[in-house]
C-alpha cells in the first residue's frame, strides 16, 4: 500500500493509497484496517463509474464486475464510518461529446443518486458522507477552485477541506501496546536489518522499549522510532510508525506479526468463533469450505469448521441453530480453523485486532468480528 504524508490547516494526514483492482483487494484490506476515514475516488468519465459499480450477471460482487461495491463494504466492515466521495475526470466529458458546466453537474448528480442508496445500505450514515468533485489532471478543487472552471457551480468543500472535517478515531492509549506489522522495511542504516512499519493500535512505546514479537514470542528492543523518515520520540495509539528492532535479523519478522507488551502478549490462535455477515455471494457457505481469513495485516488459509447459528441481520437474534448453510446477505456465527496461527483479539477487547474478512477464490464472501478465541498456539 503506497503511503504519503501531508498537512492541512487542522490535520496531519497520512494517506494510504489502496489499489482498486480486484487482484489487490488484500492490499486494500491492509490499508483500510489502518485508516480512520476513507476518500472514495470515483471515475466520473463516461462509462467509468458504471464499469466500477457494476456487478456480474447474477449479482456476484467482484466477480466480473467493478470493485466499487466491494471496497465500500470492506471499508465499512473494517471500522471506517467517515467517508468523502470524490468524483473525478468530469473534465473529460467534453471530449466524449458532453461539453459544458451543465453536463458536468448532471453527471455528478446522476452518480450520486446511484451510489448514495448503496452507501446507506452498506452502513454509512448519510450525514457522515461528503460529496465533492475534483480533477487530478488540473488540480481543480483539491485545495482551491477557479471561478472559470467547469466545477465553479459546486459550493461544497475542497478535498483538503473535506479531510479537515474528519475526526481522529478512538485512541486506546490506556491498553497494552499493540502494533501490527503492515510492512517489513528494507535493511537500512537508520533502523537496522529488522525494521517494520505499521499503525499502533493500542498503548504506546518509546525507543529503548522492550517488546514481544508475536507469534514467535521473541523479546526484542526498539532501536529507533520514525514517522515518514523523521525521528519519533513516542509512538502512541493511532500513530503510524517505523521501528528498528534490536535482537532480530533480516527475515525474522514478517507482515502480519504484532509487536506487543512483553507482559501482556497478544493471543495466538488456530481456532476462533466469529460473527459474520455474508456479501452478495453466489455459492453458499457450507461446513468444510476452504477459505482465507484476513485480519489486520495478516492472512491465513482456513476452513469453516462449524456453522453454529444463523442470525437475524437486524436484531442479531438466533433464527436457526446449526443451519446447513449460509447464503447471500445473511448473518451467522461461524467457527473457523486456521492452517497457521494468527495474532487476534476479541473484538470486544481490541476492535482493530478483532475484525476479520473471509475470502475465497479471490472474492470476499463474508466480513465479521471475532467473538471467541477457542484454540491457542
Model-derived features with residue positions:
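P-loop NTPase nucleotide-binding/switch module
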Residues: 1-14, 55-57, 136, 176-179
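C-terminal effector/interaction modules appended to NTPase cores
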Residues: 8-11, 187-377
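Conserved, well-folded catalytic cores of nucleic-acid-processing
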Residues: 9, 31, 35, 41-45, ...
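Conserved Switch II/interswitch segment of TRAFAC-class P-loop GTPases
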Residues: 10-14, 18-24, 33-109
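Residue-level signature of catalytic and energy-coupling elements of molecular machines
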Residues: 17, 28, 39, 75, ...
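Short coil/turn segments at secondary-structure boundaries
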Residues: 29, 52-54, 98-99, 145-146, ...
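Canonical P-loop GTPase G-domain recognition
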Residues: 81, 92-176, 180-185
Amino acid at each position: 500500500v503506497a503511503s504519503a504524508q501531508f498537512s492541512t490547516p487542522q490535520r496531519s494526514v497520512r494517506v494510504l493509497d489502496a489499489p482498486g483492482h480486484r487482484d489487490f483487494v488484500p492490499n486494500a484490506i491492509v490499508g483500510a484496517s489502518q485508516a480512520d476515514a476513507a476518500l472514495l475516488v470515483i471515475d466520473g468519465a463516461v462509462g467509468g463509474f458504471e464499469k466500477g459499480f457494476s456487478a456480474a450477471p447474477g449479482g456476484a460482487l467482484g466477480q466480473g464486475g467493478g470493485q466499487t461495491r466491494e471496497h465500500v463494504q470492506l471499508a465499512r466492515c473494517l471500522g471506517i464510518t467517515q467517508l468523502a466521495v470524490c468524483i473525478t475526470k468530469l473534465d473529460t466529458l467534453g471530449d466524449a461529446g458532453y461539453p459544458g458546466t451543465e453536463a458536468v453537474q448532471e453527471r455528478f448528480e446522476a452518480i450520486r443518486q446511484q451510489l448514495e442508496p448503496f452507501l446507506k445500505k452498506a452502513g454509512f450514515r448519510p450525514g457522515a458522507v461528503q460529496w465533492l468533485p475534483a480533477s487530478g489532471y488540473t488540480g481543480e478543487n483539491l485545495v482551491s477552485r477557479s471561478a472559470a472552471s467547469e466545477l465553479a457551480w459546486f459550493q461544497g468543500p475542497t478535498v483538503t477541506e473535506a479531510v479537515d472535517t474528519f475526526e481522529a478515531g478512538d485512541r486506546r492509549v490506556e491498553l497494552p501496546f499493540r502494533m501490527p506489522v503492515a510492512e517489513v522495511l528494507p535493511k537500512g542504516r537508520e533502523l537496522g536489518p529488522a525494521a517494520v512499519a505499521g499503525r499502533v493500535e493500542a498503548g504506546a512505546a518509546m525507543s529503548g522499549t522492550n517488546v514481544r514479537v508475536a507469534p514467535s514470542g521473541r523479546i526484542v528492543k526498539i532501536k529507533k522510532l520514525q514517522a515518514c523518515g523523521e525521528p519519533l520520540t513516542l509512538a502512541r495509539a493511532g500513530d503510524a510508525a517505523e521501528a528498528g528492532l534490536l535482537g532480530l535479523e533480516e527475515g525474522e519478522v514478517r507482515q502480519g506479526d504484532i509487536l506487543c507488551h512483553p507482559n501482556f502478549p497478544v493471543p495466538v490462535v488456530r481456532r476462533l468463533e466469529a460473527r459474520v455477515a455474508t456479501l452478495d455471494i453466489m455459492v453458499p457457505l457450507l461446513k468444510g469450505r476452504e477459505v482465507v481469513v484476513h485480519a489486520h495485516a495478516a492472512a491465513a488459509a482456513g476452513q469453516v469448521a462449524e456453522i453454529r447459528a444463523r442470525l437475524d441481520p437486524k436484531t442479531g437474534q438466533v433464527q436457526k441453530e446449526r443451519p446447513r448453510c449460509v447464503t447471500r446477505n445473511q448473518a451467522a456465527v461461524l467457527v473457523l480453523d486456521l492452517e497457521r496461527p494468527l495474532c487476534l483479539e476479541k473484538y470486544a477487547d481490541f476492535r482493530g485486532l478483532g475484525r476479520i474478512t473471509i475470502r475465497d477464490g479471490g472474492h470476499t464472501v463474508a466480513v465479521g468480528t471475532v467473538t471467541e478465541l477457542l484454540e491457542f498456539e
